[in-house]
Amino acid sequence: MKRKCQDYESRLPDNTAVKQQQLPAFRLQLTASEILSGFFAIGLFCLGMGIILLLSAKSIKEVEINYTEKCATCAKLREEATNFDKECNCSISFYLPQKMEGNVYLYYKLYGFYQNLYRYILSRSNIQLVGADVKDVRNCAPFRTSDNGLPIAPCGAIANSMFNDTIVLWYNFNSSTHIRVPMVRTETAWWTDKYVKFQNPAFQNLSSAFAGTAKPPNWPKPVYELDENDPGNNGFINDDFIVWMRTAAFPNFKKLYRRLHRIGNFTEGLPAGSYSFIINYNFPVSRFQGQKAVVLSTLTWSGGSSLFLALAYLVTGAVTLLASFSMMALHLKLKERKTFFLQ
């Protein structure tokens, strides 16, 4: 019997704080006043951030010009597929009442274009876009190969539907002097997209790298000729192409097109005065009953003119404060009842 007791005791864990699970621990016991203070602090913080973000968004200067109806003649021309090789330009004049100081950004905006459709998003080849194999078109239905059987580069529905209007901004200094506003067409894409997700094939000559492939059906030129003025902005690393390939979550969206080159008369930004947009109309929107617009905008430390983040903070802060006052009222009521019974 004694031996059995010794065997049993030998199997017991050591009598230490760790093995006996007797380590000292801090057990947080929050009081009602501490919880209410935390809720009030969170609510006030969210309200304060919402007000700051709202004021920041309101300080942004933005001009949006819808040119769907103003370029109706060109739109009608583009409805016929046989007119794809006919050039059509339209001019849109507007007046800028106040100077847009600092960096100014030019966007194109589409209404009613659903880039978030499941089959549309999947219609691309990431293997092709990183330059590993320009003939990889496995996931690009229905735009895999051309009528001649050649693999399309870049393939897929996203690339084929790329926005291809050409937008030029002119400053009408006076009735006889018109100055083209200098714009930068690079550094408009995300850094990770430009240098990680999109790469050209490892060839010095891009035309040779894309030999044996065909351009997308809706494109007027192959991918290695997208920028005739800058050889370093051609192929899969073209900024306009990369920006378009980052699909939007909502049917109404804007994408960065150009940045103001702050030189000459535009060192401090866009001066107030008369301007004109000359648009080479190529992208049809009547087929899906959409609309097109150009947007000139400045930015602040908080980003663009979207009010979503500011409203989200304001709503969160308001709901939190409302809950705080409700809990405080309930706490005081229960406290009074407890005091009454103790008496």
Swiss-Prot record:
Give yes or no: UniProt keyword Transmembrane helix: yes
Record topology, Cytoplasmic segments? 1-34, 328-343
Where is it mainly found? membrane
**Compartmental location:** Membrane
Per the UniProt entry, the glycosylated residues are: N66, N164, N205, N265
Q: Which domain of life is it from?
A: Eukaryota
GO-annotated biological processes: phospholipid translocation
Cellular compartments per GO CC: endoplasmic reticulum; Golgi apparatus; plasma membrane
Q: Which Pfam families match?
A: CDC50 (PF03381)
**Topology Extracellular: residue spans:** 56-306
How does this protein sit in the membrane? Answer: Multi-pass membrane protein
Q: What keyword terms does UniProt attach to this protein?
A: Glycoprotein, Membrane, Transmembrane, Transmembrane helix
Where do the TM regions start and end?
A: 35-55, 307-327
UniProt keyword annotation of Glycoprotein present: yes
What does the sequence similarity comment in the record state about its family? Belongs to the CDC50/LEM3 family.
According to UniProt, the name of this protein is: Cell cycle control protein 50C
Gene encoding this polypeptide? TMEM30C
Name the species this protein comes from.
Bos taurus
